[in-house]
């Protein structure tokens, strides 16, 4: 039965956390409505408080009806419902991705306010299949092709207990219990590649890859035997003699849904058993992240890891140091990896960061470029600045705001600054790093640079911590 499968999944995913409350994202579609009813039964059995969250993206007339419907269901189940609104600001460029990020920002911020650690979402088996196909078309590596049932966003655990349940079973459950749901009309549009894949697979047809590029990456042919063998399970290479039926099907660009699911499971197993442990070891051994918002990568230790893991480490550092939520594309990271192999010092920019080789180490620090971080007024006790630093004030400080240090301000207070600790830690790159740190100003005057313990008055007291909103399916930075 459906509930038994759901219960087994969620108990395995959550483990023995001893949670007293949990949240759930519900849109009004069949997937999330089914999840709501299943989660409600489970929450009642385990005496857990369930909070229902809906996000209106303000893009469709029907969305207001959907939110109202979910509110009514929540009330009937005696569950608290929260309706959030995404402001697209009439900017429709890259809207799907921005709406997704905005939705997760809203939901996880609410979870933090409510002191909730876990958010359930209704990603089901068909979603995983579609994602695999889309990533295959983008020529993703093994990390990109893998999927995870537990993710992190804004330090909230995102759990997907429907991962092995097809949409058809969820719809059947709703029909059997006479439960209404809404269909998003945009799901039937051929405008989005995901919809084309979905419609084809729903009819039982094979998935045909959308492009004809060869998908085996030249740069991985010289990798270790272990990672090459692992890679050929995902990418075809007939010369190895290990190509599976799926690999041969992929070679002619054709895969059945069952074959995709099988391949996804193989990929996930490889990631979980081999590549993920290697990635965690690589970060522990080769990476040092400092409270000043920069990092060093030990290139001697870095060299022993597989190429796929090397790409992930570089992206891990770029995301954390830049404060961005998305990883750089492989084709952007590849030139950096090639430069590293040349064993010469260099200085490059990528993904909002400066990447500088100093002998056997790689220094990565923030680059503002033409787009400076937004100044933040310290109205509340604390504020997040540049998506990286949390600044907390320990006293009432009127009209102060957080910003970056300009060259003009630096010249004024330069002689009063003790930069020796930062100079030593950053291999004499202290001036560049200093300009990326948060400072507190009142009007035009710098009153504090907490990182280097600079205060123009003994009455000021601010705390600062490096707290990037890091999102990864493989590692968690907290």
UniProtKB/Swiss-Prot annotation:
Keyword Methyltransferase: no
One annotated GO biological process: tRNA modification
Entry's Gene Ontology cellular component terms: cytoplasm
Enzyme class: ligase
Predominant cellular place of this UniProt entry's protein: cytoplasm
Reaction equations catalysed: cytidine(34) in tRNA(Ile2) + L-lysine + ATP = lysidine(34) in tRNA(Ile2) + AMP + diphosphate + H(+)
Cell compartment(s), UniProt: Cytoplasm
Pfam family, one: ATP_bind_3
Keywords linked to the UniProt accession: ATP-binding, Cytoplasm, Ligase, Nucleotide-binding, tRNA processing
Any one GO molecular-function label of the UniProt entry: ATP binding
Transmembrane intervals: none
EC number: 6.3.4.19
Gene3D superfamilies: HUPs (3.40.50.620)
Organism domain of life: Bacteria
Record text about domains: The N-terminal region contains the highly conserved SGGXDS motif, predicted to be a P-loop motif involved in ATP binding.
Name of this chain's protein: tRNA(Ile)-lysidine synthase
The organism of origin for this protein: Rickettsia conorii (strain ATCC VR-613 / Malish 7)
């Amino acid at each position: 039965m459906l509930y038994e499968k759901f219960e087994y999944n969620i108990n395995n995913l959550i483990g023995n956390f001893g949670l007293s409350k949990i949240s759930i994202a519900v849109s009004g579609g069949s997937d999330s409505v089914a999840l709501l009813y299943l989660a409600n039964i489970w929450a009642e059995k385990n005496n857990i408080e369930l909070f229902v969250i809906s996000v209106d993206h303000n893009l469709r007339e029907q969305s207001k009806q959907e939110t109202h419907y979910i509110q009514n269901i929540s009330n009937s189940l005696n569950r608290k419902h929260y309706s959030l609104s995404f402001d697209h600001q009439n900017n429709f460029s890259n809207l799907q991705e921005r709406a997704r990020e905005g939705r997760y920002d809203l939901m996880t911020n609410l979870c933090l306010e409510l002191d909730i650690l876990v958010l359930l979402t209704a990603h089901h088996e068909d979603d995983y299949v579609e994602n695999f196909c889309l990533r295959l078309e983008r020529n993703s590596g093994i990390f990109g092709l893998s999927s995870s049932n537990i993710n992190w966003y804004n330090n909230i655990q995102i759990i997907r207990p429907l991962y092995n349940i097809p949409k058809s079973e969820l719809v059947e459950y709703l029909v059997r219990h006479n439960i209404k749901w809404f269909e998003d009309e945009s799901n039937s549009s051929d405008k989005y590649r995901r919809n084309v894949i979905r419609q084809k697979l729903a009819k039982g047809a094979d998935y045909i890859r959308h492009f004809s590029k060869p998908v085996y990456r030249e740069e991985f042919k010289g990798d270790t035997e272990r990672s090459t063998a692992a890679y050929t399970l995902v990418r075809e290479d007939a010369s190895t003699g290990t190509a599976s039926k799926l690999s041969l099907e992929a070679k002619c660009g054709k895969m059945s849904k069952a074959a995709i699911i099988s391949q996804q499971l193989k990929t996930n197993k490889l990631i979980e058993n081999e590549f993920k442990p290697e990635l965690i070891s690589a970060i522990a051994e080769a990476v040092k992240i400092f409270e000043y918002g920069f990092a060093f990568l030990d290139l001697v230790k870095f060299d022993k890891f597989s190429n796929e893991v090397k790409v992930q480490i570089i992206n891990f550092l770029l995301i954390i140091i830049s404060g961005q939520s998305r990883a750089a594309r492989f084709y952007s990271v590849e030139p950096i990896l090639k430069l590293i192999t040349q064993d010469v010092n260099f200085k490059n920019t990528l993904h909002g960061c400066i990447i500088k080789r100093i002998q056997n180490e790689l220094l990565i620090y923030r680059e503002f470029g033409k787009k400076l971080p937004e100044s933040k007024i310290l109205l509340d006790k604390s504020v997040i600045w540049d998506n990286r630093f949390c600044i907390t004030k320990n006293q009432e400080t009127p009209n102060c705001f957080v910003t970056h240090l300009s060259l003009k301000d630096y010249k004024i207070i330069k002689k009063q600054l003790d930069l020796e600790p930062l100079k030593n830690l950053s291999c004499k790159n202290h001036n560049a790093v200093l300009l990326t740190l948060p400072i507190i100003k009142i009007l035009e005057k710098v009153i504090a640079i907490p990182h280097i313990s600079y205060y123009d008055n003994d009455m000021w007291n601010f705390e600062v911590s490096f707290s990037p909103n890091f999102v990864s399916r493989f590692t968690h930075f907290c």
